[in-house]
Amino acid sequence: MKSDKELFGLAQMYVTLENEYRKASEYGLDELGEIKEGLENIRDTLFQKGYDIDKFLRYQEMYLTMSIGEYAKFIKTLE
């Protein structure tokens, strides 16, 4: 389960950074390079550790659609 917990955490971070990247692009903010580097680091980690990319994408979708209660229950299953 540790790898699932880490993979879900990476999916959360990726979704958050993607949203920040969109906002930074829209408003022309200086953080674009740092955010892009963060996204690349997550992608590198996924491949270096051999994570299941389909599962990563499912976790991203879950994170985007979960209610707070569903999120809390899911996190407990990963512990």
PLM regions and their residue ranges:
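Glycine-centered signal
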Residues: 1-2, 14, 57, 69
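Short intrinsically disordered terminal tails
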Residues: 1-5, 73-79
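N-terminal acidic leader/helix
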Residues: 2-28
